[in-house]
Amino acid sequence: ELEEWFTDLVLEYKKWTDFMYQWKLTRQAGIKKMQFPFPYREGQKELVTQVYHTIYHQKKLFLEAPTGVGKTISTIFPALKAIGENRADKLFYFTAKTITRTVADDTLELLRFQGLRCKSVILTAKEKICFCEETKCNPVACPYAIGHFDRINEALFDLISHKDRFSREIIEEYARKHNVCPFEMSLDLSLFSDAIICDYNYLFDPHVYLKRFFAQGVSKDYLFLIDEAHNLVERGREMYSATLIKEDFMALKKQVKTVDTVLEKRLEKCNKILLGYKRECETYQIEDFIDIFIGALQSLSTRMEKFLEDHDENDHFVSQDLRDTVLDFYFKVSHFLLIYDLVDEKYVTYSYFTESGAFALKLFCMDPSTNLQGCMEKGKSSILFSATLLPIQYYK
C-alpha cells in the first residue's frame, strides 16, 4: 500500500517535471527565432544593445527616454534574448500603473507573433480579482477556499497546458471552471511563468513581497525591469514607513473589554504611553526613544495572536466583525514592529496630529535607498527606466 502511494506520488510529480523540461526547450527555441517587430527608430538599437550588455554583465542601468520612444519593447526584447542565452530564467516587469501592465502584456503578445514562446502572468491585487463581495480568505466566508488545495493542481495543469498568456480574464475563467481562488491561482501560476508583470510591492514591500522567489536562500536567476522608476523613491518611503494612531488603541479596547481582559489591559498600556507622548507634542515632536512603547507593542502583538488562535472562524463566542477588526489591527502593529527593526540613521521617528485631530506616531523612512538596493540584489540585473529620471544622482 505504501509502495503504491509512493509510486503514484512520483508519477504525479514526473508529469510536472516532464512538462517543465519540454516547455523550457520550446521557450528557448522560440526566443532564438524571435525578431524585433519593427524597424529600429533612431537610437532604439543602441538602447536595446545597452540593456543587453547591462544584463550580460549583471549590472544596473538607469534609462531616461521620452514617452513614445518604445522603452517597453526596448527593454523586454533584450531581456528575453538574455533568457534565451541562459543568462537568466525569469523576467519580472514591475510597474505602479494598470495601464503600463497592459502595455507590457501587449508587448509580449506582439513578440509571440515574432516567434516568441513565453508563459506570462499579470498579478492582480487580491481585492480586485476576488470573486466574493468581501475579501475574507477562509473556508467559512469563501466557497472557493473550501477544498482549494484539493483542486488547484488540476486547475494549474489544465491552464498551463492550454495557454501561454495568463491574463486576469483567463485566470478568472479557469478559476471558475475548477472552483479555486483566482488570486492564489495567479500566485501559483507565477512559478510556471517566464515573465511576471506586477506592482512594485511584489518585490519591494517588506510584507507582501513574493517569498517564493525573494526569500533568503531562493535562487536569484531573475531580471528586473522597473517601469516609471521615478515613482519608486516615494513608493519606497511609503512601504518602509509605518504609522500607528492612538485613537485606534482606544477604539479596539472598548470592543474587546467584555471578551478578553488581558488584551484590554495591553491596549490600555500602549494607549497610556502614547498619551504621554501626546502631552508633550504641540504640532509635531521628534521621538528619540520609544523602546518602552515597542516593548508594550510586542506584548500586545503576542496577545492578539493568542486571541486570533482562540477565536477562529468557527468560534461563535466572538463575532466575525470583531475578529476581523482585531486581525486588521494586528497587521498594523506587525507592520510597525517590522519597520522598527529596520530603523537606522535614514529614519526619523516623530509624533504629530492628523488633520482630523487624531494623535499619531510615525516611523518615517527619509531615504529608502538601502532597502530598495537590498531588494534589487535579489535579481541578477535591474533596468530602471522612465521619461523623467533627472537629476540622475538623486535616483542612484
Where are these regions (language model features)?
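A contiguous, basic/glycine-rich beta-loop/short-helix subdomain that forms a polymer-engagement track
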Residues: 171-196, 207-215, 307-396
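Conserved pre-motif I regulatory segment
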Residues: 19-64
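Walker A/P-loop
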Residues: 56-78
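Walker A/P-loop NTP-binding motif
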Residues: 52-53, 72-87, 107-111
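A substrate-engagement module of RecA-like helicase motors
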Residues: 2-12, 16-35, 87-196, 201-204, ...
